[in-house]
């Protein structure tokens, strides 16, 4: 025989995600659907209290009493046991509806059916949306990205269950007002994000992307003393030209770092004592051929010191310094990147970290041009956060 009662799971309230100062980044809020079992109510109660309920609903939702009266009468005559009264109510509205005539008699005498749905809200709106993460579907509340996914085992809690009775195909109503097993709420997570810095980073990034009509971009702000990430903004462009928190580019996008790598290249050569900041390098008039491939600067700087070459971000300067020092022994230079673990993942709790790629002699990407290209940030791949982590160590005196 078909079971007429069943323990139906009750979702636990998901833990909150907070910014550094206690501001909410994500919180669980219950939403409520109120439905009506027109078959449970006695004829006398329906006749006496239904018009009062219709009037109360009409006043509260700004519709006519006759609209609700017709709905309730059709539900009664049609033997409907799951008639929708109101959807997606907040808790305040739910309490008001619950106390209206007829419904205040409860599930058996008043036909009240309450469907509680946990929903996730982000008080800061679109700011830090990708960093915080979101669920793939509202039904399963499954999280696959961001902090929501990284700390899901702690945030999700333990579901409870409630005994419900089958009243129609696919429709169930609670047997009593009490739960058989109370859900246990998830733990809260406090992040290092500073909402003021996050807000500034978000709008500064948006302004620059709009100005240059760029495809996407990211901003990460890291505290030097601790390495704590105080802001992480990611914006990608839509087909319509607007921007939104599309992907976590800072964590997931491994690409050629360009001129941001020059400092890293320079630091390795200094550490190896292969170059000196005062030595002279000829950047010529802004172009120089390396093994048949031309490298250019925006303008010529002539003969300048190695320190000045880094200061003016000269492609030719860095390529010349590194190629002259290491063309016969590139492994000496490359070993510093391995020693500094630039070729390995940071090991973040957030999934999807991009894999750094630093080629070595014998690799498919290696050629005579590899060394001068790498000196100014090409022919290798790192994520923005991996580059920033190295810069933060430099700013922190190597720690």
Stretch-by-stretch model annotation:
Residues 28-40, 76-80, 179-189:
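Acidic/histidine-rich, surface-exposed loop or edge segments in extracytoplasmic proteins
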């Amino acid at each position: 025989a078909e079971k007429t009662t069943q323990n139906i799971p009750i979702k636990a309230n998901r833990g909150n995600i907070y910014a550094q100062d206690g501001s909410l980044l994500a919180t669980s809020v219950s939403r409520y659907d109120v439905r009506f079992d027109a078959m449970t109510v006695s004829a006398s109660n329906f006749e006496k209290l239904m018009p009062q309920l219709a009037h109360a609903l009409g006043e509260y939702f700004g519709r006519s009493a006759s609209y609700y009266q017709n709905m309730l009468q059709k539900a009664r005559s049609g033997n409907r046991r799951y008639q929708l009264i109101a959807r997606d109510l907040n808790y305040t509205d739910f309490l008001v509806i619950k106390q209206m005539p007829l419904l205040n008699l409860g599930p058996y005498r008043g036909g009240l059916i309450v469907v509680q749905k946990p929903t996730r809200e982000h008080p800061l709106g679109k700011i830090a949306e990708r960093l915080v993460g979101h669920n793939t579907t509202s039904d399963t509340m499954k999280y696959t990205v961001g902090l929501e996914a990284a700390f899901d085992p702690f945030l999700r809690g333990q579901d409870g269950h409630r005994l419900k009775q089958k009243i129609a195909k696919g429709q169930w109503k609670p047997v009593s007002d009490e739960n058989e097993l109370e859900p246990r709420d998830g733990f809260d997570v406090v992040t290092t994000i500073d909402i003021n810095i996050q807000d500034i980073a978000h709008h500064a990034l948006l302004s620059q992307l709009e100005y240059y009509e760029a495809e996407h971009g990211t901003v990460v702000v890291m505290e030097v003393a601790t390495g704590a990430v105080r802001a992480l903004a990611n914006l990608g462009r839509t087909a319509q030209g607007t921007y939104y928190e599309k992907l976590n580019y800072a964590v997931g996008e491994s690409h050629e770092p360009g001129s941001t790598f020059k400092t890293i290249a320079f630091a390795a050569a200094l550490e190896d004592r292969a170059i000196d900041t005062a030595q002279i390098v000829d950047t010529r008039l802004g172009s120089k051929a390396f093994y048949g491939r031309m490298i250019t600067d925006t303008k010529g700087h002539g003969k300048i010191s190695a320190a000045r070459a880094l200061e003016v971000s000269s492609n030719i300067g860095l390529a010349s310094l590194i190629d002259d020092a290491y063309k016969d022994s590139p492994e000496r230079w490359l070993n510093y990147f391995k020693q500094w673990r630039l070729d390995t993942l940071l090991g973040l709790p957030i999934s999807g970290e991009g894999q750094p790629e630093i080629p070595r002699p014998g690799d498919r990407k290696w050629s005579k041009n590899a060394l001068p290209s790498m000196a100014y940030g090409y022919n290798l791949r790192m994520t923005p956060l991996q580059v920033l982590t190295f810069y933060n160590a430099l700013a922190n005196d190597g720690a």
